[in-house]
Amino acid sequence: MAEGPSLHPKLQVDSNIPIEISSQIPQEPARNLAFQMRQSPLVTPGSTTKSSLSVPERNLLKQESQGPSRQSGCMLLSDKYVNKQTGPMASRKFRKERTVYTKEQQGLLQKHFDECQYPNKKKIVELALSVGVTKREIKIWFKNNRAKYRRMNLQNIEQVLPESNGSSKAVSESTHFPVVASDNGESMCSGTFGEDSIPKFNCS
């Protein structure tokens, strides 16, 4: 059989050599693009604004961005502090235990109170040792007892005042001047107190 026409020896390509023409063609523009980006990077809208701002303006922007976070941190700290102060533990600390005295102790303290309502330091120490409490508790007992004594006196005064007012009105209404007699035995004048407490004279 006749063989087909053979290619020119110069145009013949060795089949063993890989053909890289198609793969090399698109890579060259990519390399050129990478090189161009290194020489002149792309300019985005954000980069233009940042570069146009001066240093003080950038600092202001940073402070504004950090401001709300700092304020929120302060608010959280203040809330924690308020919760600590107004919690149940804080109310328990301010509660004071009340000292309960026996009848004998109360009688002894009342006896000294009747003698002196303001005991000196020496007397307070003696009472604290005899009763078995602290000096502070003795001072508190005397203070409370003085307040109680004052309240009782005020109540007694308020009860006495209305009675005295009523009796004074009755006395003023029924008070008469005695009849003044002359040497001849004839009455000269007599008088009575009126409602306005001004004496009225009736002369004869």
Curated annotation (Swiss-Prot):
Source organism (scientific name) = Mus musculus
- Provide the primary localization: nucleus
Q: What is this protein's record name? A: Oocyte-specific homeobox protein 1
Q: Which domain of life is it from?
A: Eukaryota
Summarizing the function annotation, the protein's role is: Transcription factor required for zygotic genome activation (ZGA), a critical event in early embryonic development during which the developmental control passes from maternally provided mRNAs to the expression of the zygotic genome after fertilization. Together with other Obox family members, required in early two-cell stage embryos to kick-start the major ZGA wave by facilitating RNA Polymerase II 'pre-configuration', during which RNA Polymerase II relocates from the initial one-cell stage binding targets to ZGA gene promoters and distal enhancers.
Q: Name one GO cellular component term.
A: nucleus
Q: Which GO terms describe its molecular function?
A: DNA binding; DNA-binding transcription factor activity, RNA polymerase II-specific
Q: What happens when the gene is disrupted?
A: No visible phenotype; mice are viable and fertile. Female mice lacking maternally transcribed Obox1, Obox2, Obox5, Obox7 as well as zygotically expressed Obox3 and Obox4 are infertile: embryos arrest at two-four cell stage due to impaired zygotic genome activation (ZGA).
Q: Does Nucleus appear among the keywords?
A: yes
Where is there biased composition of kind Polar residues?
A: 37-54, 62-72
Q: Which UniProt keywords apply?
A: Developmental protein, DNA-binding, Homeobox, Nucleus, Transcription, Transcription regulation
Does the keyword section mention Transcription regulation?
A: yes
- Tell me where in or outside the cell this protein is found: Nucleus
Instruction: Map out region (Disordered) in residue numbers.
Output: 28-73
Pfam families from the xrefs?
Homeodomain
Q: Which residues bind DNA?
A: 94-153
State the InterPro entries in the record.
Answer: Distal-less_Homeobox_TF, HD, Homeobox_CS, Homeodomain-like_sf
Q: What's any GO biological process attached to this entry?
A: maternal-to-zygotic transition of gene expression
Q: In which tissues is it expressed?
A: Specifically expressed in oocytes and early embryos.
Concerning its family, UniProt says: Belongs to the paired homeobox family. Obox subfamily.
Report the record's disulfide bonds. Answer: none
Q: Which Gene3D superfamilies match?
A: Homeodomain-like (1.10.10.60)
